[in-house]
Design a protein with these regions (language model features):
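Redox-cofactor-proximal catalytic regions of oxidoreductases
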Residues: 43-50, 55-68
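A short acidic, helix-capping loop that chelates divalent metal ions and anchors anionic groups
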Residues: 70-76
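Flavin (primarily FAD) cofactor-binding/catalytic cores of flavoenzymes
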Residues: 2-17, 23-41, 45-47, 76-388
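A short small-residue
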Residues: 66-70, 329-331
Length: 388
């Protein structure tokens, strides 16, 4: 049995040390609140570093800005995943944010008047908790994937790095979203490649063009940050649809997939004789399958009654139905930009202000409850002021 260490009581614990957690840390420090950030990765930014090697942002660097510190370098370039990781690490160092790395939270529960955070042999007590991570953390893989021949290599966007991982032979990329298209282009340079699934649409312009950089991106940023929000009728109307709709292709276009020699095929509907079965009855002869089929919620470690019937956190702008528990970095938490490097800072400011105000209110309530009643005050010979 692991020995457990009970840490001192902390006002606020932030779970997650990515862009959401660091943004929360910036505003907590600004408000003078005692806090600690816990991150499962051994190094700040590793959630980005550990993604596939060729990954770049879809937006120019000038739109990458966490509160208080802009992204350095060429504002017109598209940052690599390692550049984003280094930026996050520099951000934490610059603002001296208290991040404890290599701590994977296994359970969050309530223990009397405080939260209990359990991570291996460690325990933390907190008056408030900010869960700072996206809704969807776990790759979604269909159940029939387990019926594929064991000799086939199966990967996801979380585990894929570069074509050197792959076995000789064909590659089937399942999912025609941005991750699937990017990875298909990457592997097609060295392997026969198929991409399966229904296209989710695409942005018609070249993101490297002058028009995109100086007209399209500013317009999209304005719409995503100021128009498609919970504060506008159109934002409230569109939110349910946007939460469940696939993002259109941004960098890679369908034409580029064809030009790269990638074969477009229909959906994968099952397994036949150990091979992926397409909806048209074909079974492509591949040795590798990369599942780019989205993600599922990764909040199973939260042992609190805070989820709705769909398994999503019950919250309004990050303030949950459980007093003292907050969320940050959720898709469309307030706006279409909420889960991005563009919009998470604004949400963090709101959440921290709400946390501070509610903490003050809760403390006043505790002080009032501790005050003696008139009868108790008289029995203890304590002067008790009465209204005239």
């Amino acid at each position: 049995m692991k020995s457990q260490f009970r840490a001192e009581r902390i006002h606020t614990v932030v779970i997650g040390g990515g862009q959401a957690g660091l943004s929360a840390g910036y505003h907590l420090a600004k408000q003078g609140i005692n806090f600690l950030i816990l991150d499962a990765n051994n190094r700040i930014g590793n959630a980005w570093r550990n993604r596939w090697d060729s990954l770049r942002l879809f937006t120019p660097a000038r739109y990458v800005e966490l509160p208080g510190m802009r992204f350095p370098g060429d504002g017109e370039g598209f940052p690599t995943k390692d550049e984003i990781a280094d930026y996050l690490e520099s951000y934490a160092e610059h603002f001296k944010l208290p991040v404890q790395s290599g701590v994977r939270v296994e359970r969050l529960s309530r223990d009397g008047d405080h939260f209990l955070i359990e991570a291996g042999g460690l325990q933390y007590e907190a008056d408030n908790v900010i869960v700072a991570m996206a809704n969807y953390q776990v790759p979604k893989i269909p159940a029939f994937a387990q019926d594929l021949d064991p000799s086939l290599l199966q990967l996801t966007p979380q585990s894929y790095r570069n074509p050197s991982q792959l076995q000789e032979g064909g590659v089937l990329v399942v999912g025609v979203g941005n991750s699937g298209a990017d990875i298909a282009i990457d592997v097609a340079r060295s392997h026969d490649t198929w991409i399966a699934g229904k296209e989710s649409g695409h942005i018609p312009w070249d993101i490297n063009s002058f028009l995109a950089r100086h007209l399209a991106f500013p317009m999209i940023r304005f719409l995503g940050h100021h128009v498609l929000t919970l504060g506008t009728p159109i934002g409230r109307k569109k939110r349910p649809e946007m939460l469940h709709r696939a993002t259109p292709l941004i960098r890679i276009k369908p034409k580029e997939l064809v030009e790269a020699g990638i074969q477009r095929v229909g959906r994968v509907i099952g397994v036949q004789e150990g091979k992926p079965l397409l909806e048209d009855g074909r079974t492509p002869d591949v040795r590798n399958v990369i599942w780019c089929t989205g993600y599922e919620p990764g909040f199973s470690w939260i042992d609190l009654p805070v989820f709705d019937q769909q398994g999503e956190p019950a919250q309004v702008r990050g303030v949950s139905s459980v007093p003292g528990l907050y969320f940050l970095g959720l898709h469309f938490q307030y706006s279409m930009s909420s889960a991005t490097l563009i919009g998470v800072g604004r949400d963090a400011e709101y959440v921290v202000k709400e946390l501070k105000a509610r903490s003050r209110s809760a403390e006043r309530g505790r002080q009032i409850r501790k005050m003696p009643t008139p009868a108790a005050a008289e029995s203890l010979s304590i002067p008790y002021a009465r209204k005239a």
